[in-house]
């Protein structure tokens, strides 16, 4: 562990022989030298109360009248909570995924501060209102990016299932909520309708409705292939395709490590040849079912294995895009990481009580996630936000 600042206090430990020595008072400190130092890092669990007083003056020699001072703009009530309390409450609510009632309990137990869950909701709401000035800039940065990751997950709001839509890059995160998982919810998120780059996703059908270049999450496909290997061990095609995807990833990693602009053409051709051979095996091992005697409306049921074969065959160009374009990743882990905290929040705290509460949480999480990607920790980012300096999240801390 590293000590990041000078010690706040120093405790000296004299030799045990000095304790009770009749000559101790005659020994000067210059007789002693430091043999070894050890450090104990601790925190103080207490509230800090600052009293603000405005003063008045009678008979000022300059103004010759009664003059009165004024309180700072941020000191507006007789008793109020400071920015540090609001910062901690918001961090616990977002990154900590703690419910409002538990935040109230934590504050009372740690600092002997009694804050009602309603007050915590108000703190989060005020913070979210300040964050929204920055969300437009975050959104525009993602729209103008070359590669963006997309994902969605369900949450419960007041007993109803709604959907969180995530759009993110390695520098920016933008989260919104909608009652629709598909095209309507994606349009409400506002990124995909204006996006012109490469969209990375898990092959959910609604993403294909946008006229874009697409890249698929091959880690997701590998998980599906493994499921087939476990359930149908006699089939060879899923094993062969897993090996092919791993070989493609290794080739991409080697190309990046050698600063190549692309994977060599002969290697790319060999990947295509292997893929087509594997698909021929897949057709033999799991052929399409015969046409039903009675045709019914809707999509024909073909089983999970056959559905995966058809999906992979139709989207091979998007699957292999990561070896043709060095900007495209092998998987969609970026989006999954950025949306993971939402899943943790739901698991730990349960459902949101209101749609506005969910929006507040997602707006603050978008801001804090973006700040983290720029090397700025959550405490510094929220303190900057509350003091009107939220542009700090777009700065480079190394400069």
Protein language model features and the residues they cover:
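Catalytic center-proximal scaffold of phosphoryl-transfer enzymes
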Residues: 1, 57-59, 64-399
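Short, flexible loop/hinge motifs at secondary-structure junctions
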Residues: 1-76, 121, 150
């Amino acid at each position: 562990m590293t000590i990041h600042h000078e010690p706040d206090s120093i405790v000296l430990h004299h030799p045990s022989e000095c304790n009770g020595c009749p000559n101790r008072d005659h020994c000067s400190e210059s007789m002693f030298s430091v043999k070894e130092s050890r450090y104990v890092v601790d925190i103080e669990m207490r509230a800090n109360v600052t009293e603000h007083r405005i003063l008045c003056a009678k008979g000022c020699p300059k103004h010759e009248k009664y003059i009165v001072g004024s309180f700072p703009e941020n000191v507006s009530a007789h008793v109020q909570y400071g920015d540090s309390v609001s910062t901690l409450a918001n961090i616990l609510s977002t990154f900590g995924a703690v419910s409002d009632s538990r935040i109230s309990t934590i504050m009372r137990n740690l600092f002997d501060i009694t804050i009602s869950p309603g007050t915590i909701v108000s703190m989060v709401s005020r913070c979210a209102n300040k964050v929204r000035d920055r969300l437009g800039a975050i959104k525009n940065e993602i729209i103008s990016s070359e590669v963006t990751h997309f994902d969605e997950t369900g949450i419960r709001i007041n007993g109803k299932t709604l959907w969180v839509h995530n759009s993110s890059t390695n520098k920016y995160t933008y989260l919104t909520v909608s009652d629709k998982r598909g095209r309507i919810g994606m349009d409400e998120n506002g990124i995909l309708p204006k996006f012109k780059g490469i969209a990375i996703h898990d092959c959910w059908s609604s993403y294909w409705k946008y006229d874009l270049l697409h890249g698929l999450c091959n880690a997701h496909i590998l998980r599906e292939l493994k499921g087939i290997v476990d359930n149908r061990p006699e089939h060879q095609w899923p094993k062969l395709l897993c090996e092919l995807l791993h070989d493609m990833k290794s080739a991409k990693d080697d190309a990046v490590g050698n600063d190549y602009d692309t994977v060599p053409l002969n290697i790319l051709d060999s990947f295509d040849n292997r893929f087509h051979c594997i698909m021929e095996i897949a057709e033999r091992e799991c052929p399409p079912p015969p046409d039903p005697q009675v045709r019914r409306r809707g999509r024909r049921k073909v089983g999970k294995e056959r559905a995966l074969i058809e999906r992979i065959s139709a989207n091979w160009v998007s699957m292999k895009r990561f070896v043709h374009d060095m900007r495209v990743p092998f998987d969609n882990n970026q989006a999954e990481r950025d949306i993971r905290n939402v899943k943790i929040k739901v698991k730990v705290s349960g459902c949101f009580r209101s749609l506005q509460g969910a929006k507040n949480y997602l707006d603050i999480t978008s801001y804090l996630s973006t700040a983290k990607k720029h090397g700025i920790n959550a405490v510094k980012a929220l303190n900057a936000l509350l003091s009107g300096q939220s542009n700090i999240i777009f700065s480079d801390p190394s400069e």
